[in-house]
Swiss-Prot record:
Cofactor(s) it depends on: Mg(2+)
InterPro entries found in the cross-reference section: PRibTrfase_dom, PRTase-like, Upp_B, UPRTase/APRTase, Ura_phspho_trans
Binding locations of uracil: I194, G199, D200, A201
Species: Francisella tularensis subsp. mediasiatica (strain FSC147)
NCBIfam families in alphabetical order: PRK00129.1, upp
Protein name: Uracil phosphoribosyltransferase
Length: 209
């Protein structure tokens, strides 16, 4: 599995601010959007271009470069992934949106999809999953499996922080996906929180406890 930890100083600086215990909802939300925007720029760097012909400003036909294929679909994992969508839209404002909701079954401890609204022609699009944290990897693995079952063939993932345990699990389950993250953190604690991590990103984005 391709794993890219973005080392850009602006990404590291902004992520450092997000780790503060005293951070406000407004600041956490803003930084989530800004880092997602920077990561989206990195993800799209490898997109294939094609030449198309348009009518230029001089009234003559000219060739320009455009990204090849259908517009990507951004796939936020509910609910925290919603806070990352605007960062993607800054670079891909015409992106389609496919939403996936997961909950953990108390008996099996496995993620179960409770909601999925996917766009059409997934087999012709890049699917960009966004979720602030990759902890155990359970929800991410289930989301990738759901997308593949629906026809998706090109799946990329953006997270703000990732645990080594989650990366390993994802790589074993889906070695063909690509992961772009602002940080590979140290480990998971006994409560399955990423250390040093960000705390509960969903609560911090939406101002809940």
């Amino acid at each position: 599995m391709k794993v890219v930890e973005i080392s850009h100083p602006m990404v590291k600086h902004k992520l450092g601010l997000m780790r503060a215990a005293s951070i406000s909802t407004q600041e956490f939300r803003r930084l989530t959007k800004e880092i997602t925007s920077l990561l989206t720029y990195e993800v799209t760097a490898g997109f294939e271009l094609e030449k198309i012909e348009i009518l230029g400003w001089q009234g003559e036909n000219i060739e320009i470069d455009q990204i090849k294929g259908k517009k990507l679909t951004v796939v936020p994992i509910l609910r925290a992934g919603l806070g990352m969508m605007d960062g993607v839209f800054e670079h891909v404002p015409a992106a389609k949106v496919s939403m996936v909701g997961m909950y953990r079954d108390e008996k099996t401890a496995k993620p179960v999809a409770y909601f999925a609204k996917l766009c059409d022609k997934l087999d012709e699009r890049v699917a960009l999953i966004v979720d602030p944290m990759l902890a155990t990897g359970g929800s991410m693995i289930a989301t990738v499996s759901l997308l593949k079952k629906a026809g998706s063939k090109d799946i990329k993932i953006i997270t703000l922080v990732s645990a080594p345990e989650g990366i390993d699990a994802l790589a074993k389950a889906h070695p063909d996906v690509e992961l772009y993250t602002a940080s590979i953190d140290s480990h998971l604690n006994d409560k399955k929180y990423i250390i040093p991590g960000l705390g509960d990103a969903g609560d911090k984005i939406f101002g809940t406890k």
